[in-house]
């Protein structure tokens, strides 16, 4: 499951442009499947400045704890607070209701892959 309209990173994050200088990102279906049942998500705070490629949160599953890496540089303008009470949404809808962070871009992002290149990676 690799939607065509998104960009991806080698660290298994997806990126969706909202067209107004912001992007939304989360982890891919491949990542959530590898993690297993997600039980906790730690996200950056609104107003925090992220640097592309740097850790910005964590996802805890029944198998392990994995870092979330910022795929872009910018200021966090929103986080998915619904994941606090329902972290399993990342498992059931990683590209929809399981989104994690919205960022106002201020700089370059990590190298990205289109859907075909990401499918080749996984």
Question: Which residue stretches match the model-derived regions?
Answer:
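Charged, alpha-helix-enriched surfaces in structured cytosolic catalytic cores
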Residues: 71, 85, 113
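Short, solvent-exposed beta-edge and connector elements
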Residues: 35-40, 62, 71-73
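Acidic, low-complexity mobile loops and tails
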Residues: 1-55, 88, 92-122
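Short, charged beta-turn/beta-strand-edge "cap" motif at the junction between a beta-strand
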Residues: 56-57, 62-63, 82-83, 107
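Short, Lys/Arg- and Gly-enriched loop/turn segments at beta-strand edges
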Residues: 60-69, 86-89
